[in-house]
UniProtKB/Swiss-Prot annotation:
Effect of residue 12 to A: Abolishes nuclease activity
Annotated ranges, domain Exonuclease: 8-161
InterPro entries: ATP-dep_Helicase_C, DinG, DnaQ, Exonuclease_RNaseT/DNA_pol3, Helic_SF1/SF2_ATP-bd_DinG/Rad3, P-loop_NTPase, RNaseH-like_sf, RNaseH_sf
GO MF annotations, alphabetized: 3'-5' exonuclease activity; ATP binding; DNA binding; DNA-directed DNA polymerase activity; helicase activity; hydrolase activity, acting on acid anhydrides, in phosphorus-containing anhydrides
This protein's record includes keyword Hydrolase: yes
Source lineage: Bacteria, Bacillati, Bacillota, Bacilli, Bacillales
Family statement: Belongs to the helicase family. DinG subfamily. Type 2 sub-subfamily.
Cellular component terms (Gene Ontology): cytosol
Gene Ontology BP annotations: DNA replication proofreading
Signal peptide positions (record): none
Name of the protein: 3'-5' exonuclease DinG
Length: 897
């Protein structure tokens, strides 16, 4: 890297408006030769007020700046320190523009010769990181950042991460480094100089044996699993005893019974349903049972989970902990569908693509580094989003496999027999088909959180036609010979003429005209759907924030679909007899579009259940058309029930009305199930109270203000008495945001953090909620389950309404045809299950004490109240007004002490 000096700068300011706001703190960390050699830090005085938000974010208050210098008093000193350095910052435009403006106000012209953005560096160096926010990068890479948004600490942290990135680059194979150098020329900043120096100073040596080469790609060699050699002659009971002892867990006879029950069902190839109480530690039980089954029979077990979070917990936490506790080496692997794994031929094609797009260029560099690291080739490791994901998905769709391609899915297949425990999720379990032969290698399966299977099956059987997706897919082809795939075809035709290639002539002008007509026909199709929406009854789905049309005539839609399919067929005829790879890519894209339209057309003609969804009633671009192709019961029967010899469904909430019948009826085949109820929980009924307010008016949809005000009053009463955190669960965003707005305006909550559910941010919000002592979390259906509520004081879960799906919910509409009485057989069991899951958020260990507040009087006044009351049999129940609620809180608080 030479002896260049990097000035890693971080600024805190009064805001982000360059012409108005001021710098209030500057931190600089100087780096040379991958070593921190110096630091500089100063508070900066300003005559502007520091907004409360900035004070809260930075912990910098106005009195801290009283003795600090103004920028013009330290400008010369700072300039002298950084003038000959490479200027570095995280999101560099912000810091660079602010400091240049500050220098300019002091009559100093600052123009760094080279500029580096660490956001760019970190995206390339750490391609699998979930976030590139500085605090989350620091946590992911083991760097302590005690005070985020303080300039000195942020600058030092950025510098340490930059050093890690540079060291990682320097260890890469030379061919990879050279490709990064060439690609870096297309970046926004001066990273190419850094890569050039690394290439120039590279100590040439043979390629390390841990790597192999495919075309121009250096990739990490895949190491096959060794056949398991678990030497154990004891019983499951002794295995369980050793595990809980070494892991520091409580010995629970019922947990052992659960493990023994699962093992017995596996050994006898049975099909079983097991309800194991929430907070039971069931994952340890089924992991030990699966391991013991493998030890005794040599057969491996598939475990399907509900979420990626639980998948990760099993693979990265629970199984490694078992390995250490038992001194075993358990071969466990995440198993997905073939399309979830990378092929090196696809990466090669992406690298050769001449798309001049910044995000695509970053993606190419990420792929080059990722493929030197990944043992699995699991595409989801890359956490692709936005334009990168759309580009990548399109490349997968149009990829024509290269000769001698290296596909990582084949590694999974090759090692399947040596895997003791396979981990998958419900979506992959249901989606797997004949091509995914890895699933056929497992005869035994444990399905955790089995009550969620129908939701994933419904997603699987529902086909979608989206304006945004079709528009994007058409855009990848282009409208003229200067765009995307049409450009490649145009270049091929020119090459055919110049080089006399042995392929038939391509009618470029005809192709261009056809594509323009396809674009127009697509616009016509969605304009027709848009007109139908405007002429129909529209129902709001508040949970998903969409507007739905359930009843509509399909004649005009079918007419437009027929026209666009016909045009696609005629366009495909242009390429008859041409087998060139460029033509194959375009044909594949056109066939993808044709199949999309054709599947929807066939389903609509057959009269399958369908509905139209639109996010914004004034924007055609937000339209989606959904069609249900198959019955959920058929898919669950074929893809799950008939696939395995032994099959164990396990959940904390499988029963409804003291019976497993509601879950059994999700399969349209009369199969005998062994059923078990195992109470392994540490939960004690005396620790938990259910309070039902008597002074809250019944919910009225047209006027919910009074209902919302009552909820807020109870939150005030709870926080005033306990000073503890509270989880409030809603069935609509509208009510959630009404409560949020009221809480934010009340002085009682000035020292509370009010958090609300946000799209794709739930994991982060849960972390924040669990870290704060005084916090209120407002959430919808997502938080009714799969959420570990941590608190030192009293715990409180408030349920605004019973979690019934609205009759205008798309799920209700799609499932209606599968039941004689949809409400009794599907909606009511679903609501009771979700309610039970909500109750399960409260007590997670023997020391927890808490209270559940249910505001919905249907819990005690409806004709179906008995089904909910059954779920509360183990809880102490009390009905009363807000004064009695306060009295109960004080009693619980006294016991807690």
């Amino acid at each position: 890297m030479g002896m260049a000096t990097y000035a890693v700068v971080d600024l805190e300011t009064t805001g982000n408006q360059l012409d108005f706001d001021d710098i209030i703190q500057i931190g600089i960390t100087f780096v040379r030769n991958n070593q921190i050699i110096d630091t500089y830090h100063s508070m900066i005085r300003t005559n502007l007020e520091i907004p409360p938000f900035i004070q809260a974010l930075t912990s910098i208050e106005e009195n801290m700046l009283q003795q600090a210098p103004y920028f013009n008093q330290v400008a010369e000193e700072i300039y002298d320190k950084i003038k000959d350095c490479i200027f570095v910052a995280h999101n560099v435009d912000f810091d660079l523009n602010f400091i240049k403006k500050a220098f300019k106000d002091c009559n100093i012209q600052y123009r760094p010769k080279k500029v580096i953005d660490t956001l760019e560096i970190f995206k390339i160096a750490f391609p699998t990181d979930k976030s590139y926010q500085l605090s989350e990068l620091a946590e992911a890479h083991g760097i302590t950042l005690a005070n985020a948004h303080r300039a000195d600490e942020d600058a030092a942290t950025t510098a340490k991460l930059m050093i890690l990135a540079f060291e990682k680059f320097e260890k890469l194979p030379l061919d990879t480094l050279k490709q990064l150098y060439y690609l870096s020329k297309q970046l926004k900043y001066d990273l190419y100089d850094i890569f050039f120096e690394m290439v120039r100073q590279y100590d040439a040596k043979p390629l390390d044996k841990s790597y192999e080469k495919f075309e121009q790609i250096i990739y990490r060699k895949q190491v096959d699993f060794k056949k398991p050699t678990t030497n154990y002659n004891g019983s499951l009971k002794s295995l369980y005893s050793k595990a809980v002892d070494q892991l520091g867990l409580t010995y629970r006879p019922q947990q052992l019974y659960l493990a023994e029950t699962i093992l017995d069902q596996l050994m006898h190839s049975e099909k079983a349903m097991i309800e194991a109480s929430l907070g039971s530690g069931k994952s340890l039980a089924y992991l030990l049972a699966a391991l013991m089954y493998n030890i005794e029979t040599g057969k491996h077990v598939m475990i399907s989970t509900n979420t990626k979070l639980l998948q990760s917990q099993l693979l990265e936490k629970d199984i490694p902990a078992m390995n250490e506790a038992l001194n075993f080496k358990i071969n466990a692997l995440l198993i997905k569908s073939k399309s979830d794994y990378i092929s090196l031929g696809l990466i090669s094609q992406i690298l050769k693509d001449d798309t001049s797009n910044y995000e695509v260029n970053i993606l190419k560099m990420q792929l080059l580094i990722w493929i030197t690291e990944t043992p699995s080739g699991d595409i989801q490791e890359l956490n692709l989003k936005g334009g990168q994901k759309m580009y990548f998905d399109q490349k997968i769709e149009t990829y024509v496999p290269a000769r001698h391609d290296v596909h990582y899915y084949n590694f999974i297949k090759r090692n399947a027999q040596n895997i003791q425990i396979g981990i998958t999720n419900h979506a992959h379990l249901i989606h797997s088909d004949v091509e995914n032969s890895i699933y056929q290698l497992f005869d035994d399966c444990i399905v955790d959180e089995a009550h969620r299977l129908p939701d994933y099956a419904l997603n699987q059987v529902t086909n979608e036609l989206s304006y945004a997706d079709i528009k994007y897919q058409l855009g990848l082809i282009g409208k003229n010979e200067n765009e995307k795939l049409l450009k490649a075809i145009d270049q091929l035709e020119k090459q055919r003429i110049l080089e006399k290639l042995d392929i038939a002539p391509i009618d470029i002008f005809g192709l261009k005209a056809s594509m323009n007509e396809i674009h127009e026909l697509n616009e016509q199709l969605f304009s027709t759907i848009f007109t139908i929406i405007n002429d129909s009854d529209v129902y709001d789905d508040d949970i998903h924030r969409f507007h739905n049309v359930f009843t509509f005539e399909t004649k005009d839609i079918l007419k437009d679909l027929h026209a666009i399919i016909d045009k696609l067929n005629k366009t495909l005829e242009i390429f008859n007899g041409i087998s060139h790879k460029t033509v194959k890519s375009l044909r594949k894209q056109l066939l993808y579009l044709k199949d999309k339209f054709k599947n929807i057309e066939q389903s609509l003609k057959a009269g399958h259940t369908s509905f139209i969804s639109i996010k914004n009633l004034s924007q055609k671009s937000t339209i989606r058309l959904y069609v249900k192709d198959y019955a959920v019961k058929d898919v669950l029967t074929k893809q799950v029930l008939e696939k395995f010899k032994s099959l164990i469904f396990i959940s904390g909430t499988l029963k409804f009305n003291h019976s497993f019948d509601a879950f059994k009826q999700l399969f349209n085949k009369d199969v005998h199930f062994n059923t078990f109820e195992v109470n392994t929980s540490l939960q004690s009924a005396k620790n938990t109270s259910v309070f039902i307010p008597s002074d809250v008016a019944s919910y009225q949809y047209k006027n919910i203000d009074e209902y919302v005000a009552s909820i807020v009053s109870y939150i005030i009463e709870y926080t005033t008495i306990t000073s503890s955190k509270c989880l409030v669960l809603f069935t609509s965003y509208k009510m959630m945001h009404m409560v949020q707005d009221m809480l934010n305006e009340l002085p009682e909550f000035e020292d509370y953090v009010v958090l609300t559910q946000q799209q794709n941010q739930n994991y982060k919000i849960v972390q924040q909620f669990n870290n704060f002592d005084k916090a209120i979390l407002l959430g919808t259906s997502t938080f009714f389950e799969g959420f570990d509520f941590q608190a030192n004081g009293i715990k409180c879960v408030m349920i605004a309404k019973l979690p019934f799906m609205n009759k205008h919910n798309a799920k209700y509409w799609l499932m209606d045809s599968e039941f004689t009485s949809t409400f009794k057989e599907y909606v009511l069991p679903d609501a009771v299950t979700r309610f039970r899951q909500g109750l399960g958020r409260l007590i997670r260990n023997e020391n927890d004490r808490g209270i559940i507040v249910s505001f919905d009087d249907r819990l005690i006044n409806s004709n179906y109240k008995n089904f909910f009351e059954q779920t509360l049999e183990n809880y102490r129940q009390k009905k009363g007004d807000i004064q009695q609620f306060g009295k109960l809180l004080r009693q619980i608080q006294k016991k807690k002490k």
